[in-house]
């Protein structure tokens, strides 16, 4: 009973400290999301899960002295960097937006004091327009980034570069495929052509030979039938000539013409 009574205050103390720890974590996150000076604070989005504080400090300290660097862990994917001078923050936004930091291409913007989402968060609800909010692109008040003229120019340049890169890739792939086709045609051995020619020639010769043999046999039989018909018709013609009537006058064997004997007169 005494041991159980002693363990209860320890459990209560641990629960209290854990709740205080999580409360401070949430307070810190809320401070970084909502509090602080928005002119010196920079939002870094699209970070990887393994982003380190030292890498961010090296990348952003190039533009000026830093106050603090805070990286979100639950959920991960974004961070906040606070400068001492607002001009250094603007230079960092212009220089590091779209660069590769911690193994991923990050998005760097000036903090406006409104909550942002990472890749793992749900999109926040829209709030009404505030004239004190600043643009992420030019840093001026009165409009947002999607209405900024710089953002439209950058988007047009990106679309043009993408279209140029796509057209170049298509041209390169087409030229490469054509060169491959030429290589395959030139690299094809001549033996295959000779073999195909031989095969086609042999097939044509076989066909012509078979046709000539059949034709010769046909013509031979036809010529034989014609010769037989001619040989049979020739003796008939000779017989018809022999049977034709002889001339009326026939000479005697002595050569004198044969005359019919007149009847002798009886004295």
Curated annotation (Swiss-Prot):
Keyword Nucleus attributed: yes
Biased composition regions of type Basic residues, renumbered to the chain: 152-209, 223-251
Annotated region described as 6 X 8 AA repeats of R-R-S-R-S-X-S-X, given as residue ranges: 182-255
Coiled coil: none
Sequence repeats: 182-189, 190-197, 198-205, 206-213, 240-247, 248-255
Record flagged with keyword Transit peptide: no
Region Sufficient for interaction with NXF1, residue ranges: 110-127
Phosphoserine: modified positions: 61, 192, 194, 196, 210, 212, 221, 223, 225, 260, 262
Residues of the RRM domain: 40-113
Any one GO molecular function term: protein domain specific binding
Residues recorded with modification N6-acetyllysine: 53
Protein name: Serine/arginine-rich splicing factor 7
Gene that specifies this protein: Srsf7
